[in-house]
Every structure is written in C-alpha cells, then in structure tokens.
From Swiss-Prot:
Name the UniProt record assigns to this protein: Importin-9
Subcellular location: Cytoplasm; Nucleus
Similarity-based family: Belongs to the importin beta family.
Native species: Mus musculus
Bias type Acidic residues, positions: 943-964
Molecular function in Gene Ontology: histone binding; histone chaperone activity; nuclear import signal receptor activity; small GTPase binding
Record keywords: Acetylation, Chaperone, Cytoplasm, Nucleus, Protein transport, Transport
Coiled-coil stretches noted in the UniProt entry, renumbered to this chain: none
Domain Importin N-terminal as annotated: residue spans: 43-119
C-alpha cells in the first residue's frame, strides 16, 4: 500500500475526495460481481459514470496491484483497467472514447503498474501485462523510456512470476509494435530472447517457448518493413539469424523431457518456417542441417501420433502453456506441415520436397488416418461427421492438414506425386495385410486413409495409369481392396469410405463392376445401415452422377434411380442441417441425370422440396439448395406445368401474407425462388407467372419496408423484363396500369432518398436492363429515373451502391452518348455546376475500385468511348472538367503513422478529366494483363526444376523483382482481382443478362491495347503523355508505346 499511497501523494489528488471516489469504485466493482441481476445492472451503469473521472484509471491500477485486496475485486479491476487503457489512453486509438487520460494520471499509472507484473496470481499478472503493453504501444519510448530496463531487470531477477509477467508484456507488445518502434526494440529484445531460449537450466520450457514466439513475431514484422524500407532486415535481424538458427537445430534434436516437449518444438518449427519464408537467401546454408532434423521430427512424430491419437494404444499428458492452454501434440504436426508448405512456396527449396516425395507421401497417409476420438464423435453425431469430412469444412484436424499437404504437392508436382502416391499406397496396403494377419483390430484405418488419399487426387492417378506413367494395379485396387472391404464388417467408416472411393474411379471400371458398386451404394442408403454408411452412400451417389455425366454413360444409373430417390427422401426425413444439405445437393444432381425419369417423379420431388423449404425457411443454405432443385425442374419442359401449379400458389401466398404472420426473411427467399423459375423458363411464360406471380411480387416490393425483400423484388422484376418484356407490357391491372408502370414504381421506390441506401445495391442492373430492353418506350420516364439516380448518388456511401448507380451511366455511354451528355449538362449537380461534372468526378475516383469482370468491361470500354468522343468531337463539356488526380506526399514525411495522418490531411493534384480517363484506362490494362498472366501461369510452368541455378543469384536481381509490389496501394492490389476468374465463384457471371451482352465476350486486354495504340498515334497524345507517371509509362512500354 505504501507505493500506492506515495503515488497518490505524487499525483496531488486531494485525500478525502479521492478516497470517496475509490470507495465508490470498490462498491461498484462489488456490485458488478453480485449474483443479483438488478444490483449488477445498476453497478454496470454506475461504472460508466465513474469511467469519465480523472482518477478512475489510477484507482483501478491501485486496486489491481494491492496485495491486501480481495482477489475477485483485483481480478475485475485488472480486466476493466485493460479496457480503460484501450479506450481512453490515446485519442488516436481506433477504440478511443473521450475523455483522454490526463498526463498526471498517466504518470501515476505507469509508476504503479509494473509492480503487478510480479504478482503471484496469474490472471491478474496477465491483465496487467496486457495493460502495460497497450500503454507501451503509445508511450514507449518517448513517454516511458525506462520501461524496457524494468522488463530486462525482471527477466534476470530469478523471480518466476516477474519473468512470466515481463514475457507476457513483450509477447503482446511485439504483436502490436509499430515500424517506427521496431528499430529500437529488435536490438534490445532479440539478444535477450536468445539468452532466455538457450538457458535451459535457468528458464522453464514455457518461458523459453515464449522467447521463440517473440523472435518469430519480430521476424515477420521486420520482413514486412523490408518491403518499404530496404536494409531493415540487414540491420535488425541478420546479425542474430545465424545463432538463433543453430540454437533451433539443437532444440529440435532434444528428446522430450524437462527441457523440451511438443509445445516447445512447435514454437521452434514456427520460427524456422518464418525464416525460410521471409529470408530464404539467409537460410540456404543452414538447410543441410535443418532438413534432416525436421524430417526426423516428422517421422518420429508419425509413429507417436499413431500410437497416442489414431489408435489410442498409449496415453500421454499434453503440455499446458503458461496461460493454461493445452498444447495438443497435433500442434507440432501442424507446424511440421507448415514448414513443408513454406518449402513448396520458395523456388530455392522446392526441389528438396520433390526429392523426398515417395517417403513424404507415405507419412502423409499415416497422418490421414481416422483417430479413435473422431470415431467416437462421428458415431454419436452424424451431423459432425458430414461437417468435418466436407471439402469446405471449417474444422482443422491433422487428417485435414495432411490432406491439404497432399493436394499441395500434387498440384506442384503432378507426375512425380502420382508415382510417389502409387508407391506409398501399395506399401501401406501390403503392410496392412501383415497387421491384419497378426490380428490387430486397427488395420482398416490404413485402408481407409489410402482410399481417401487416392480418391482426393483421383485425376492425377487415373491420367498417369492411362498414360502408362505409373504401374499401379487399378483393377486390383478396385476389386481386391475396395470391393473386398465392402464385404467386411471391420468398421462402418471403412464401408463408407469404400463406397465413396469407388465413385471416384468410374473411368477405370467395366460396366459390370460399376453395376456391382452401384448395387452396394443403393444398399448403403438403406435405413438399417449406420448413419455414417448412409451419408457416405449419398456422397458416392453424387460422385457417380457427376462422373457418369462427364463420360456420357448415365444409362448405367437409370435402373437404380427409383431406389436412389426413395433412399434420399427417407434420409432427409430423419436428419436436419448438415445431413439434409448433403441430401438436397445430391438430389439436385440426380434430377439432371435423366429428364424423363425426373418428369415421372416430379410429383415426389417437388412437394418434398417445397416442404423442406417451408420447414427450414430460416436456413439460407437449405433455401438456396431448394432453389437449385427448382431451377433444374424449370429447365425440364415436362416438369414446368405441374411444378408451377404446386409452387407458384405457395410463393404467392407467402408474398401476400402480412409480415408479422410469416418468419422473417421468408418473403425475400420466396421472391428469389420465383426469380429462378422465371429465369429458367422459356418464354412465353404461363398465365400463372404473368397474371398471379408478377402482380404479387410487384405489390409486395412496393409495400414492404424490408431491404432484402425490396432488393430481391427488384431483381425478380429485372428477370421478368429480361425474359419477356412484351408479356409484362401487355398485362394490365384493373386500374389500367400495365406491368411496365409497376416496374417504374419499383425503380422509384428503390431510388427513393428516404429508403436505406442498400436497397439500391442492384438497382443499376434493373435500370440498365430496362433501358436496353425498353429504351424507346420509356420516354419521359428515363429522365425521371436518371434524376433519381443522381440524387441517390449524393447520399450513397458504400462502394457497391455507388458502383451500381454509376454503371447505369456507363451503359448509357455505350448506347445513347450524346443524349446522355446533353441531359447531364442540363441539370445542376450538388455544387451548382452541371451534373456531368459530379458524375465524372464520382466515377473516376472509384473506377479502380470497381469489382466484377462484366462491370469492369462495361465501365472500361465506356471510358474509352468518352475519351475518344472528347477528342474527336472536341467536346468542351468534357474538356473543361477537372478532377482529382493523384495524392501528394511530402518528401520529408517518412512513414505515415496514425498521428501524422491525423495532423496532415490528404492532398491531391487537380488534372483534366480526359487525362484522368487515360490514366484509368492504362490502370485497367495493367490489371487485366496481370490477371491474364496469373491465369496462364499453370503449374506446369512452375514445375521446371529451376532451384539449382538460383542459389547463387545476385542481391540486386531479387531487389528489383520485389520493387513491383511495394509501390502499390492496397486498393490497387484489391483491384487486380477484378478480372481473375476464380475470384467470384458464382455471383455475377451467373447473371444471364451479363452473359447475353456482347460486351461480356470482349477480350479486354486486346481491346484496351488496340485503343491505346491508336490513341498514341493522335496528335493530341503529346499533351497527355506529359501527365503520365513512371508506372503508367512502363505499362505502355509493354504494349510497344
């Protein structure tokens, strides 16, 4: 207490008042701990009142470090103090809430807190460490220069609590360290961490692990700094890399015991991986030592893992870290795999993996086995089995990590991996025979893992067998292993895997063998089978439908379809969530196998799908799977009539129901399903769709206040306009309003300034479709729409909404350029200047952020047309506009820290609009070239073993390569993905209107190259070229300008 009293005196706070506040605080903290809800709630309100007083933080610090205080109060005070520092210490913090802690209070708190780092209660110690670290982030070194000396004294004090406290501070601090602090931190911390790490007789395992973690964090941070400041690594980390690496090599060789365990080795491996990833050149010389040792760790760990986890024939105690976290042995395995991934990512080390493939894959398969724990969980919970074994699972286990590694090596070395996998699997299967003969019950797990491994990368196996690159007895594997295992009762999980594996290899089967496997699969669906077998049978059916469609031999499936359908529907009735999703997905592909069969059972499939959709209306995954099934049924002409008779009245009644009578979100989903039906039905549409569904969706959209319903309603009307504008225009209500009038009403509502901006996220697509389909019939209405878009643009803040609105003008540039310019010049924008200036300023400041391949093409080609028109027609309306060019950085600014950004607001150059457009076109070309290059860089190109001659390359070469990215802004890096095909999986390229637009087919790289080459020939080009920066000139050089 003496320290606290002295600190209180130092702060000059008047005694009784301070005491009164402190007592109030203790009462309030006691209240927060009360079991009575009312007392608790009152105390939580009271703490908010106290939080804004000057002494609040000081009193929390005093209570936290008071050894005589009640433990519960001290713990709570330390947690609240941690939050207080985050929100009040510095006005530049992202979490800041006023008032800012006063200087006087800060001095006292900094004085008090380090005492809490010696605390014997670890929870208090950890909270104090967190608070100290958060303060240091803002105050060190300027306002708290002595902190590091204090921490270093604690590290050598011999007091275990103080060591742990100081290490906690350093761990937290280094995670958040800024690039301006790192040059002061690294030279002090890294040598100390080295000492702690290597002094095994002085420091405990967990403290030494933390020292390695701190080293790893610093290594990553310094590597990031190196991208912006060349030479940072040379000064900050290279001096210690060698000694650390040698110590790491020693540490990995230590047998487990008092000075080493799996948690410790995991941290060491993470550090080695960080060095290999970040500083490969420096690691080349140490690799000869490191590789054999990591390899030993991999192989020894495999045997240990199989004993303790897979078969559970041996019990072990997992180590626990200093915060009470259990460090499971699997964490060491993960870090070994991460190390191998790091080798694969670097051309210097890739060949080392290639050489070890046969052995590596042999061990990967060992790690892929099912563990006893998984068998227990999956047997008790079939939903978990589906989730864990799904391709897109969020679970992370050794089995999944091993699969990931197998897929990574198979992608990088296709031919070599096929050979290695065939060899490894053959060896495992032979060993399994011996294990089985010796009466061991776990022999089947290796069979299961081999089937999983071969099935996961089936195409490289089947291709290699076909081309004679590998000698693998495919027929023997299918009959003597997979088929034979189906007749054994070793484990339901082996049966299930065998069903799945067979479905992966139909290309290698005779029709008779396929028949046998299909028969087994249908039996596997039966209710008497264990859930894991039934679930695997569903997966296998999906595989057969998929494979047999590709090889155009679905006739083999036809006799089994009735039993498959019944089996799926029975299974869906018994399970929900994950299992149900799998069944629905499979049912959807079954619908596509034989349209005649599907039409004959529409009366089963459709009522079932409607029932599931209504029962699970709040589950978006089920809804979207139901939608997929309705889509398939819509495309089969014989199903359309009966399906619509069943489905449309259901959807209409949902749309007409009062909002409080149906589950939230159901109406929006029903509209989405209607959209799918309209899009996938050939016109003319039925009376049901035009006279009942259309008015229902229009009315529903106009009278809802739910954003999702409005958005989906707009998209649904767009489908109607796109598929059958004539029918929409011909339909009339009793008042004489036609369908087009309703569409206009909906557009006005989506653009209404009073509705949320998110309702406008897709309105651009609706308007563009409307203009392209009904352009001439819109007349006055078009002006009205464009005015509404302009006023919505003045409110919009989100990129997606702004892009949607700007795209309407981009489309009009293609079809009605002159009328558009005239219209925009006849209206004032927000500043009183013509609206054209407002639209172009908004567009050009966001073009580089637009996303979506189709949108990228529409807007880029529109910009070319505008530039061409501005020059050819000598159009002063465009030539006289000036817009924001590039951001101005002052040379003496150095790194832009948070405080600097706050003091110096952004400044921009001001350039002519047409110059800005040229710059944007060049930027689009650069992005699309990059995306195309990335797409063409197939694995084959990386396969060339180029690692041997690269070891000696000169420093300069590598530095030049790295320059490219450093100068890019995040927005540029994000924008480059606009044209990458796999960036958007489903969303917009499924948009039928986009696919029908000839612009979508354009080769943008060729178009922009051609445009720029022609533009550079024009006399005015000289005036433009003086505005281009070095990057832009470089891009033009690549196309010969």
């Amino acid at each position: 207490m003496a320290a606290a009293a002295a600190a209180g005196a130092a702060s000059g706070l008047p005694g009784p008042v301070a005491q009164g506040l402190k007592e109030a605080l203790v009462d309030t903290l006691t209240g927060i701990l009360s079991p009575v809800q009312e007392v608790r709630a009152a105390a939580e309100e009271q703490i908010k009142v106290l939080e804004v007083t000057e002494e609040f933080g000081v009193h929390l610090a005093e209570l936290t470090v008071d050894p005589q205080g009640a433990l519960a109060i001290r713990q709570l005070a330390s947690v609240i103090l941690k939050q207080y520092v985050e929100t009040h210490w510095c006005a530049q913090s992202e979490k800041f809430r006023p008032p800012e802690t006063t200087e006087r209070a800060k001095i006292v708190i900094r004085e008090l807190l380090p005492n809490g780092l010696r605390e014997s209660i670890s929870k208090v110690r950890s909270s104090v460490a967190y608070a100290v670290s958060a303060i240091a982030h803002w105050d060190w070194p300027e306002a708290w220069p002595q902190l590091f000396n204090l921490l270093m004294e604690m590290l050598v004090s011999g007091d275990l609590n103080a060591v742990h406290g100081a290490m906690r501070v350093l761990t937290e601090f280094t995670r958040e360290v800024t690039d301006t602090q790192m040059p002061l931190v690294a030279p002090v911390i890294l040598p100390e961490m080295y000492k702690i790490f290597t002094m095994a007789e002085v420091y405990g395992i967990r403290t030494r692990s933390r020292a390695v973690e701190i080293f790893t964090t610093c290594a990553h941070m310094i590597c990031n700094m190196e991208e912006l400041e060349k030479g940072a690594a040379k000064v900050l980390i290279f001096p210690v890399v060698q000694q650390f690496t040698e110590a790491f090599v020693q540490a990995l060789q230590m047998p487990d015991g008092p000075t080493s365990d799996s948690g410790f080795k995991m941290e060491v491996l993470k550090a080695v991986t960080a060095l290999v990833k970040n500083f490969p050149k420096h690691m080349v010389s140490s690799m000869q030592q490191i590789l054999p040792i990591v390899w030993n760790t991999l192989t020894e760990s495999a045997a240990f893992y199989v004993r303790t986890e897979v078969n559970y024939t041996e019990e072990v105690e997992d180590p626990v870290d200093s915060d009470g976290e259990v460090l499971g042995f699997e964490n060491l395995v993960f870090s070994i795999f991460e190390f191998v991934h790091a080798l694969l990512e670097n051309s210097k080390f890739k060949s080392t993996v290639k050489k070890a493939l046969p052995e590596l894959i042999y061990y990967i398969i060992l790690y892929m086995q099912i563990t006893e724990e998984q068998i227990k969980v999956w047997t008790a919970n079939p939903q978990q089995f589906v989730e864990d074994e799904d391709d897109d699972t969020f679970s992370y286990t050794v089995r999944i990590a091993a699969q990931d590694l197998l897929l990574a090596v198979a992608t990088d070395f296709q031919n070599e991996s096929a050979v290695a996998l065939a060899t490894a699997a053959t060896r495992h299967l032979q060993e399994a025979e011996q294990t089985k003969a010796s009466g061991t019950e776990h022999w089947w797990k290796i069979h299961e893992a081999c089937m999983l491994a071969l099935g996961s990368v089936k195409s490289i196996i089947t291709d290699s067998v076909k081309n004679g690159r590998i000698h693998f007895d495919m027929h023997g594997f299918l009959t003597n292993v997979i088929l034979a295992d189906l007749n054994l009762s070793a484990s339901p999980f082996l049966l299930g895997r065998a069903l799945w594996a067979a479905s992966r290899f139909t290309v290698a089967m005779s029709p008779e063998l396929i028949q046998q496997f299909l028969q087994a699969t249908v039996s596997g669906l039966h209710e008497t089978q264990p859930p894991s077998v039934r679930i695997s049978a569903v997966r296998a059916i999906w595989g057969y439908c998929d494979q047999l469609k590709v090889s155009e031999s679905t006739h083999v499936l036809q006799p089994f379809l009735p039993s498959i359908l019944d089996g799926l529907i029975h299974l869906a009735a018994q399970f929900s969530s994950e299992v149900l999703n799998l069944v629905m997905e499979t049912l959807c592909i079954v619908c596509t196998v034989d349209p005649e069969f599907t039409a004959s059972v529409e009366n089963k499939i459709c009522p079932f799908t409607i029932a599931i959709f209504l029962k699970y209306s709040n589950d978006p995954v089920v809804a979207s799977l139901a939608q997929d099934i309705f889509k398939e049924l819509s495309q089969i002409e014989a199903c359309q009539g009966p399906m619509q008779m069943r489905l449309i009245p259901t959807l209409v009644s949902i749309m007409q129901a009062p909002a409080d009578k149906i589950p939230a979100g159901l109406c929006a989903t029903a509209i989405d399903i209607l959209t799918t039906v309209v899009r996938n039905t050939k016109p003319p549409l039925s009376q049901l769709l035009i006279c009942q569904a259309f008015p229902a969706v229009a009315q529903c959209t106009l009278h809802t206040d739910d954003n999702a319903t409005m958005q989906n309603g707009g998209e649904c009307l767009r489908a109607y306009v796109s598929v059958t504008l004539e029918q929409v225009a011909q339909w009339h209500d009793e008042q004489g309003h036609n369908g087009l009038w309703y569409v206009m009403q909906v557009v006005s509502q989506l653009l209404d300034p009073r509705t949320s901006e998110f309702t406008a996220a897709f309105v651009g697509r609706l308007v563009s479709t409307l203009i392209s389909k009904a352009g001439r019939e819109l007349g006055e209405n078009l002006d009205q729409i464009l005015r509404a878009i302009l006023s919505k643009m003045q409110q919009a803040e989100t990129l997606s909404v702004m892009q949607s609105l700007i795209m309407v003008f981009a489309h009009l540039v293609h079809t009605q350029l002159e009328p558009l310019l005239e219209f925009l010049c006849s209206l004032p924008g927000p500043t009183g200047k013509p609206a054209l200036e407002f639209v172009m300023a908004e567009w050009t400041s966001r073009q580089h952020l637009f996303y979506g391949q189709y949108e990228g093409k529409v807007s880029s080609v529109a910009l070319c047309k505008l530039l061409q028109h501005g020059i050819n027609a000598d159009d002063k309306r465009l030539q006289d506009i000036r817009v924001k060019g590039e951001e101005i950085y002052s040379m003496d600014e150095g790194i832009r820290t948070r405080s600097k950004s706050a003091k110096n607001p952004e400044r921009w150059t001001n350039i002519p609009l047409l110059v800005k457009i040229l710059k944007l076109i060049i930027n689009e070309l650069s992005n699309v070239m990059e995306a195309n290059a990335a797409r063409q860089a197939t694995p084959a190109e990386w396969n060339q073993d180029d690692s041997n001659d690269m070891w000696e390359d000169q420093e300069e070469e590598e530095e030049e390569e790295e320059d490219g990215l450093a100068g890019q802004l995040l927005s540029d890096i994000l924008a480059t993905s606009k044209y990458e095909e796999d960036y958007y999986e489903d969303d917009e390229e499924d948009d039928p209107d986009a696919l029908k637009d000839p612009l979508y087919q354009i080769d943008l790289q060729a178009y922009l190259t051609d445009f720029l080459c022609q533009f550079a020939q024009q006399p005015c080009y000289i005036m433009f070229s003086c505005h281009l920066n070095d990057n832009e000139r470089r891009v033009l050089q690549t196309i010969g300008i």
